[in-house]
């Protein structure tokens, strides 16, 4: 954050030290300013291009997405990150964000949501091609490939008739999946030398490092 802006915020905090609502508003403003700065920041990466996944090398047209979530405390402050590549290997985007109080599973789902939303924004109406979304979360991959079809048959209920955890996020992800008729979710082992997964992990943790949650 700009030094003058930080000094101004600190002065306001001091002047309104006895006003609880003002302190909350200033804290929210500070977080939003830091989050915007993160959006504008380019986080360095190695100069070597990311290797193209085998799944899309043999396709006429395909895209690869990578998604990862992080959480400190679980529940606690969390973050998500996603990146996308086209068939030439070009990195189309990197996006990331933070939430104050969340869980690791929620951030894993959110990473997939945000990656698909960004790809949809870039592609516009050209969605009928193969999309491979790679995640190190079996929770996300099995949820999308196995659990959700069964939940929907039961009116979004599990076999024990209980409502699935994180239902709103699952429903949002399922809704977005509808725009991608040839979307596949693929599990990759985390922290095992997968370059794009490691990059998303780096982005997510960088976002958490830069935002001070109270």
Where are these regions (language model features)?
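Short, low-complexity, charged amphipathic interaction modules
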Residues: 1-41
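Charged phosphate-binding loop/patch that engages nucleotide di/tri-phosphates or the phosphate backbone
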Residues: 12, 196, 200-214
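Intrinsically disordered, low-complexity linkers and terminal tails enriched in Pro/Gly
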Residues: 35-59
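Phosphate-ester processing/binding pockets and catalytic centers
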Residues: 38, 92-94, 100, 124, ...
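RNase H catalytic domain
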Residues: 70-74, 113-199, 208
């Amino acid at each position: 954050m700009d030094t003058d802006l930080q000094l101004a915020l600190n002065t306001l905090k001091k002047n309104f030290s006895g006003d609880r609502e003002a302190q909350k508003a200033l804290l929210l403003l500070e977080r939003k300013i830091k989050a915007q700065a993160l959006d504008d920041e380019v986080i360095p990466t190695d100069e070597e291009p990311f290797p193209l996944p085998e799944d899309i090398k043999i396709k006429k047209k395909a895209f690869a997405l990578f998604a990862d979530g992080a959480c400190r405390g679980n529940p606690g402050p969390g973050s998500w990150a996603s990146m996308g590549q086209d068939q030439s290997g070009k990195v189309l985007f990197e996006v990331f964000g933070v939430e104050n109080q969340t869980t690791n599973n929620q951030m894993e789902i959110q990473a997939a949501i945000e990656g698909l939303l960004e790809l949809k924004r870039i592609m516009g109406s050209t969605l009928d091609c193969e999309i491979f979304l790679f995640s190190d979360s079996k929770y996300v991959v099995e949820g999308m490939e196995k659990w959700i079809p069964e939940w929907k048959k039961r009116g979004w209920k599990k076999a024990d008739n209980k409502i699935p955890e994180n239902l709103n996020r699952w429903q949002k992800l399922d809704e977005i999946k509808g725009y991608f008729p040839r979307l596949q979710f693929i599990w990759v082992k985390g922290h095992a030398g997968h370059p794009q997964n490691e990059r998303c992990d780096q982005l997510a943790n960088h976002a958490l490092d830069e935002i001070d949650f109270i």
